[in-house]
Swiss-Prot record:
Cofactor dependence: Mg(2+)
Species per Swiss-Prot/TrEMBL record: Neisseria meningitidis serogroup A / serotype 4A (strain DSM 15465 / Z2491)
Main subcellular location of this protein, as a coarse class: cytoplasm
Protein name as annotated: Phenylalanine--tRNA ligase beta subunit
GO MF annotation terms: ATP binding; magnesium ion binding; phenylalanine-tRNA ligase activity; tRNA binding
Binding site for Mg(2+): 453, 459, 462-463
Family of this protein: Belongs to the phenylalanyl-tRNA synthetase beta subunit family. Type 1 subfamily.
SMART domains per the UniProt record, alphabetical: B3_4, B5, FDX-ACB
Pfam (any one): tRNA_synthFbeta
Annotated HAMAP family: Phe_tRNA_synth_beta1 (MF_00283)
Reactions accelerated catalytically: tRNA(Phe) + L-phenylalanine + ATP = L-phenylalanyl-tRNA(Phe) + AMP + diphosphate + H(+)
Assembly behavior: Tetramer of two alpha and two beta subunits.
Gene3D superfamilies xref list: 3.30.56.10, Bira Bifunctional Protein, Domain 2 (3.30.930.10), Ferrodoxin-fold anticodon-binding domain (3.30.70.380), Nucleic acid-binding proteins (2.40.50.140), Phenylalanyl-trna Synthetase, Chain B, domain 3 (3.50.40.10)
């Protein structure tokens, strides 16, 4: 939103300097992006009247002029402008003047003729282009000798504000003036809206066919206008200083009313319309050539203003070329409407162009402003272009409901931290146009039609705070006794998990929670993932239920960059559906290991990491927790190299090698190893208990069992551990044999058993019965002792 300070002062009786106003607006939430004067710095330029013009004796394109600059003597100036003539008044820079760019004026000779100054164009003064080739011609009543900066108000400050989407009420000079009045307490002078008398004549019927999209539509016919009339200089200046180019008088009047009071308008050529006006949704196959010379195919989600023949304009966005006014226009139809922001929002992106009107409509326009806008525009048309106005014709659809919001003074003090007197609060609310009514707890306000953003108590507190001035709220540094929170012994710190993974050579990664739907099918067999209603892209259409897909993608990126040994982990949330259909999210830790077990080095052979390498990492991560690894058929993993991680009878995760069928699909030279565990289970741990070191030597017994291939090592270890007593300190596999001497389908598994007594030296009498018990348990499970 751009406006000039001089225009603002016609509605807000403020004497603040431009610098102070800039600070005030910014601190109140209306950020001033730029504040600059209407013209660049220059000095020594006055209004001069050309008294005579003679051809230069020695140059065809130069003229010798004598001008009156108000000093009582005529000044001779040589001028080359093609439009110079006697009787005109123009800007004149005298010797000693300094023009933009530090261009200094001094007496000089031009082809032998003395020139004591320079007659100026708009370009030479740094002013907006007036479309004239030559001197900037001033009005006939311009006072000779007056400083041009003073006459044209070139020291006027132009403010450019960054208006947030919720403050559409500030997209007009009236809205800014109302805001300044509330902030400073100065008088707010609303633009005078005169009810213009109707002189009979024609009317244009209006029908709203989409009442939910258009709450109000008003039209008025004005006949016999002079569309060739010149836009007054005062109006043209205000438009230009608001960043809008003057086009033609009828278009300029519509733009002026929009800037002045905030209501976008449109002007139709009445003679180009057929029948009544309809506000409806576009029909399939309809097209419209717009004022920007673009022809668009209209979608059925688009609101249009149409006549009996077809669409005339994109409602709230841009008019159509077929019904546009021109210099030949004699009869016009003024339009002012209220369109629901929802129907206008997004149309600028949809059709590839926007307008000042759409910028306002999609944020919300005052739904009680339309009649005032028609009256104001009618007044200006009759004043500048003449004509006879007909009656206003109004159609009404669905308008927003009037909202009432309560404000508790106690809550206001709690939130802002300052006790603002009730009388001051009431004054602020009144200046904001919120019509406060006193209640037992504070006030009840009625949100005005121009404030769509006043909906709840917090909105009112924000308004009070910014008008009162956040910088006026005293600093009150929070103080209090801080209690050190206890960390339970059964819960390990989160940072310990990160440190553990980093210490084992894993690098932390972060991936999107939005993933490719195919990943969910491949890595989790999830045919019904949680789908996003508005995905960022097609490849990010669902929420992940596993971390494996993201880790595999990161592996691919590293392989593309010639990294042949990759170890990464991620701690993040996964998403699913509970038994009751509600969404659930759990935090998990996932890891991936690809490539060699150890970095390449001279002291040992290089081998690829296998299932047992990553299983060791998982065991180390869960070292304070009793876990078992149970063979599983997880969809992402190799059927023979995968296990569920079980704790207290509950599956808390899985570990294994990626299934071979995914290697070719995801362009992986070899299978990576992966794991995924519930983070809650990782953070839970048993208490660390002190245990004395035994003074007595341990005893080792090695047992080799012949068992079926279908029987896993874990099955054997579970049986042996179940038969052990407190003397058994460790049972583990140290060798597996297949081949000669064993029946087909059988294998030999060698197990070491470490026994130790904390109080006595173990004897054969104590050891042998226990070993026999272990052998018996294994035999009962289908594993016989190898002889």
């Amino acid at each position: 939103m751009q406006f000039s300070y001089s225009w603002l002062k016609t509605q807000a009786d403020t004497e603040l300097s431009s610098d102070k106003l800039e600070h005030l607006l910014t601190m109140s939430g209306l950020e001033v992006e730029e504040a600059e004067t209407a013209a660049p710095a220059f000095a020594g330029v006055v209004i001069a009247e050309v008294k005579s013009v003679e051809k230069h004796p020695d140059a065809d394109r130069l003229n010798v002029t004598r001008v009156d600059v108000g000093t009582g003597e005529l000044v001779q100036i040589v001028c080359g402008a093609p439009n110079v003539k006697a009787g005109i008044k123009v800007p004149c820079s005298l010797p000693g003047a300094v023009l933009p760019g530090n261009f200094k004026i001094k007496p000089t000779k031009m082809r032998g003729v003395v020139s004591n100054g320079m007659l100026c164009s708009t370009d030479e003064l740094g002013l907006p282009d007036d479309g004239v080739n030559g001197l900037h011609i001033l009005p006939e009543d311009a006072p000779v000798g007056t400083n041009i900066r003073e006459y044209l108000d070139l020291d006027d400050t132009l403010f450019t504000l960054k208006i947030t989407p919720n403050r559409a009420d500030c997209l007009s000079v009236k809205g800014i003036a109302r805001e300044v009045s509330a902030l400073t307490g100065c008088a707010f002078r609303q633009p005078e809206i005169r009810k213009m008398p109707s002189e009979g004549g024609k009317t244009r019927a209006v029908k709203i066919d989409a009442p939910a999209d258009c709450g109000r539509f008003i039209s008025r016919v004005i006949e016999n206008v002079n569309a060739k009339a010149a836009t007054p200089d005062w109006m043209k200046q205000r438009l230009e200083r608001s960043g809008i180019r003057s086009i033609s008088v009828l278009v300029d009047i519509g733009n002026y009313v929009m800037l002045e009071i905030g209501q976008p308008m449109h002007v139709f050529d009445a003679d180009k319309l057929s029948g009544s006006l309809h506000i409806r949704r576009a029909r399939e196959g309809e097209t419209l050539e717009c004022l920007n010379e673009k022809t668009v195919s209209l979608s059925e989600n688009t609101l249009v203003v149409a006549d009996e023949k077809g669409a005339l304009s994109l409602a709230g966005l841009m008019g159509g070329a077929a019904s546009a006014v021109s210099d030949g226009t004699q009869n016009i139809v003024l339009e002012a409407a209220w369109f629901a922001p929802e129907i206008i929002a997004g149309k600028s992106r949809q059709y590839g162009f926007g307008s000042d009107s759409s910028f306002r409509f999609e944020r919300g326009v005052d739904y009680r402003l339309q009649a005032d806008a028609i009256e104001r525009a009618t007044e200006l048309v009759l004043q500048i272009c003449g004509g006879a106005a007909g009656e206003m014709v109004e159609a009404q659809g669905e308008l927003p409901e009037v909202k009432q919001v309560g404000l508790r003074l106690g809550r206001l003090k709690t939130v802002l931290g300052v006790d603002i007197p009730s009388e001051q609060v009431e004054t602020i609310l009144q200046h904001l146009g919120l019509q406060p009514e006193k209640t037992a707890e504070g006030f009840r306000v009625t949100a005005p039609s121009f404030r769509f953003d006043i909906e709840i108590e917090a909105d009112l507190i924000e308004e009070i705070g910014r008008v009162y001035g956040y910088e006026n709220i005293p600093d009150d540094y929070t103080s209090g006794r801080l209690k050190m929170l206890e960390l339970p012994e059964t819960r390990r710190p989160r940072f310990a998990v990160y440190n553990e993974m980093a210490a084992r050579g894993y690098r932390e990664v972060v991936s999107y929670a939005f993933v490719n739907e195919q990943w969910e099918q491949d890595f989790a067999a999830n045919a019904d993932p949680i789908r996003l209603q508005n995905p960022l892209a097609a490849q990010y259409a669902v929420m992940r239920s596993t971390l494996i897909g993201g880790l595999v993608e990161i592996l691919q990126n590293n392989l593309n960059r010639k990294q042949n040994r990759v170890r990464v982990f991620e701690i993040a949330r996964v998403f699913g559906k509970g038994s009751d259909g509600r969404f659930v999210q759990n935090e998990r830790i996932g890891g991936l290991w690809y490539g060699a077990a150890m970095p390449e080095q001279w002291g040992g052979k290089t081998r690829n990491a296998d299932f047992y390498d990553i299983k060791a990492d998982v065991e180390n991560l869960l070292k304070n927790k009793a876990v078992e690894f149970v063979k599983t058929g997880y969809p992402a993993l190799h059927p023979g190299r995968a296990a569920n991680i079980v704790s207290d009878g509950k599956v808390i995760g899985f570990v294994g090698e990626l299934h071979p069928k995914w290697l070719q699909k995801y362009d992986l030279p070899q299978a990576p190893l992966v794991f995924e565990i519930d983070m809650a289970a990782v953070l839970e741990c048993g208490k660390t208990r002190y245990r004395a070191v035994s003074k007595f030597q341990p005893v080792r017994r090695d047992l080799a069992f012949v068992m079926p291939e279908a029987m896993s090592h874990d099955d054997l270890l579970l049986v042996l551990k179940g038969a052990a007593n407190k003397l058994v300190q460790e049972i583990s596999v140290f060798d597996v044999y297949r081949g000669m001497g064993l029946p087909e389908g059988m294998k030999s598994v060698a197990v070491k058993v470490i026994l130790q007594d904390m109080e006595n030296t173990l004897t054969d009498e104590a050891v042998e019965p226990l070993i026999g018990k272990l052998i018996g348990a294994a035999t009962a499970a289908g594993a016989r002792l190898r002889s």
